[in-house]
Curated annotation (Swiss-Prot):
Organism: Pseudomonas fluorescens (strain Pf0-1)
Main localization (coarse): cytoplasm
Residue ranges, compositional bias (Pro residues): 145-155
SUPFAM superfamilies attached to this UniProt entry: CheY-like (SSF52172), Methylesterase CheB, C-terminal domain (SSF52738)
Annotated protein name in UniProt: Protein-glutamate methylesterase/protein-glutamine glutaminase 2
Region (Disordered) residue spans: 141-188
């Protein structure tokens, strides 16, 4: 059965091109289009698409507000289009917080110059997030302010980026949650003297990382490295966001940074992050031969070489199998590898690769991973 898609964008050119690209895939059917957030809600209710592609800046109602309403009234996987700017990153992260599943940079130049590459990426994303559809029937999100028909508002509601007057290290704010999934069956972990916690993730990762990291105390005794598939323009904003929400410190990694307890370093987009035996971070240019920049396998592999059996590696929600080969090296050295369970993943790809390769020492639900990291390390 074809994946039914609703395309939402106020640009006539972009609506047409996205519709044409998707319609060229025989397994995708564009069932409708909308020019603003209010139309998107009406069309989502009427057409019941499997996936919605959504722009942010639109008249009458912006994309984030529309996502919030859609998640409340007819939960549907949403793929956001975003500009490759710091502000675009902030807006995209707000949209993911509101319930969107994934995002793609909105790059008109790429559409003109690399249509086949754009088609492959867009169709792959649509197919991937459509498979998360079954998880959306249980979505629980805060009720929108307006009902029953959303009223146009000029700007999105304040995001969890907060104002500059917010406390430097507030109590962690809960991430938007779907209804709790059944807990995985692995027993609680035993405490070990880990020298490093390494977490890799992709689709669904921004919200998942927020959920995990906000459970860690400021006194967390181990350094943390984070590898999230994300464009170069986005990782700094994401690190800043996590730093405001968490009790630990979070920053985008820079070449020469030194690992220390209570600090999480986020691999910069478009580059690779490695760890040496002295606990120093090396940031390398992204290798065009690798699909992912940053790549979980690269960081996990360097950690395996530098820390032997003293790494706790966690693979969270995401497409593909990045992290599997790095996890294999970690296991060969005696380190511990956990995977997120299928029920709580947005996309059960990366964790599934770990489980199928028999590399997982434990499988936990997302809501349990943070507390189990604390139990294992503190």
């Amino acid at each position: 059965m074809a994946v039914k898609v609703l395309v939402v964008d106020d640009s006539g050119f972009f609506r047409r091109r996205v519709s044409e690209i998707l319609s060229a895939d025989p397994s995708i059917q564009v069932v409708g289009t909308a020019t603003n957030g209010k139309e998107a809600i009406d069309q989502a209710l009427a057409l019941k698409p499997d996936v919605i592609t959504m722009d942010y800046e639109m008249p009458m109602m912006d994309g984030i507000t529309a996502v919030r309403h859609i998640m409340q009234r007819c939960p549907t996987p949403v793929l956001m289009f975003s500009s490759l700017t710091h502000e675009g990153a902030r807006v995209t992260l707000d949209a993911l917080d509101a319930g969107a599943v994934d995002f793609l940079p909105k790059n008109f130049e790429d559409i003109s110059r690399n249509p086949e590459k754009v088609k492959q990426l867009l169709c792959e994303k649509v197919h991937s997030i459509s498979r998360s559809n079954r998880r959306f029937s249980a979505y629980s999100a805060p009720a929108p302010a307006a009902a029953p028909t959303p009223a146009p508002i000029p700007a999105a509601a304040p995001s969890s980026f907060g104002s500059h007057s917010a406390p430097a290290r507030p109590a962690p704010a809960p991430a938007p949650t779907r209804a709790p999934a059944a807990s995985a069956s692995s027993p609680a972990p035993k405490r070990k003297n880990y020298k490093l916690v390494a977490i890799g993730t992709s689709t669904g990762g921004p919200v998942a990382l927020q959920r995990v990291l906000t459970q860690l105390p400021a006194s967390f005794p181990a350094p943390i490295v984070l590898i999230q598939h994300m464009p170069a323009a986005f990782t700094k904003a994401f690190a800043e966001r996590l730093d405001k929400l968490c009790r630990i410190s979070v920053k985008e990694a820079e070449d020469g940074d030194i690992l220390r307890p209570g600090l999480a370093l986020l691999a910069p987009g478009g580059k690779q992050m490695m760890i040496d035996g002295r606990g120093a971070v090396k940031i390398l240019p992204g290798d065009e031969r690798l699909n992912y920049k940053p790549c979980v396998d690269i960081t996990f592999g360097s950690a395996a070489k530098s820390y032997s059996d003293k790494v706790l590696a966690v693979v969270l929600t995401g497409m593909g199998a990045d992290g599997r080969e790095g996890a294999r090296l970690l296991k060969q050295g005696g380190s511990t590898v956990w995977a997120q369970d299928e029920a709580s993943c947005v996309i059960y790809g990366m964790p599934m690769a770990i489980v199928k390769a028999d590399l997982a020492d434990a499988v936990y639900s997302l809501d349990d991973i943070g507390k189990h990291i604390v139990e294992a390390c503190v």
